[in-house]
């Protein structure tokens, strides 16, 4: 049995991973889709102080509270920042990492520095409304909520590399529209024999567009 913690991307809550989590449980695994502070059902906690450190702490605290010691962390999009930070904080609790069309930061990186120009425009385009939140894009699921801007701007601080973990998978959405901020991470994974790199016929929302293929990749991490 493998325990998965599933971390959504910007503006999304645990709901975006719940169908996948149900299928993982049907295969005998534990699965914890998480809603980060200030988002989804926790949107009432959104304020200017919520940042990347807050979201890393969300995951670290979940691992401690549930006494999870061999987790596979799965991060979609922005969630790649979060799982990297959490794995660095408590490497003794982490067995593997799966980046789903996600950022794979190095020390000092942020979403802002890794993003495309279009993404940076989105991050700050509607922030003037309250000064601290990025609005969901029009085509997002109706359940999407504003995302704390500070978490997209803050640089990550890491003490070690990803070579500490047994398995590392990168899932690239090969049919995304326009310039992809995630292609460089996929290409690095493809060239590194310590990674397993997967290109799926999917747009960015892989959980929705390629659920069967993503499930197979996650199940393979537990083999």
Task: Give residue spans per PLM region.
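Conserved HGGG/HGGXW glycine-rich cap/lid loop of the alpha/beta-hydrolase fold
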Residues: 2-43
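Short beta-strand/loop motif that positions the catalytic acidic residue
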Residues: 170-172
């Amino acid at each position: 049995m493998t325990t998965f913690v599933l971390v959504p991307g910007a503006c999304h809550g645990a709901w975006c991973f719940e169908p996948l989590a149900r299928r993982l449980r049907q295969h005998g695994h534990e699965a914890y889709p998480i809603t980060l502070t200030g988002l989804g059902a926790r949107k009432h906690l959104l304020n200017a102080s919520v940042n990347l450190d807050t979201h890393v702490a969300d995951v670290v605290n979940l691992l401690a509270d549930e006494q999870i010691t061999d987790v596979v962390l799965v991060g979609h999009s922005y969630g790649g920042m979060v799982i990297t930070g959490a794995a660095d904080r408590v490497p003794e609790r982490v067995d593997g990492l799966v980046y789903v069309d996600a950022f794979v930061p190095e020390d000092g990186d942020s979403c802002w520095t890794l993003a495309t120009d279009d993404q940076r425009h989105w991050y700050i385009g509607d922030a003037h409304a309250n000064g601290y939140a990025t609005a969901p894009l029009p085509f997002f699921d109706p359940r999407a909520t504003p995302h704390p801007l500070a978490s997209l701007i803050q640089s990550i601080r890491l003490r070690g590399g990803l070579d500490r973990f047994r398995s590392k998978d990168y899932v690239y959405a090969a049919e995304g529209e326009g310039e992809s901020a995630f292609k460089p991470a996929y290409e690095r994974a493809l060239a590194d024999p310590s990674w397993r790199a997967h290109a799926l016929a999917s747009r960015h929302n892989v959980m929705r567009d390629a659920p069967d293929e993503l499930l197979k990749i996650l199940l393979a991490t537990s083999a």
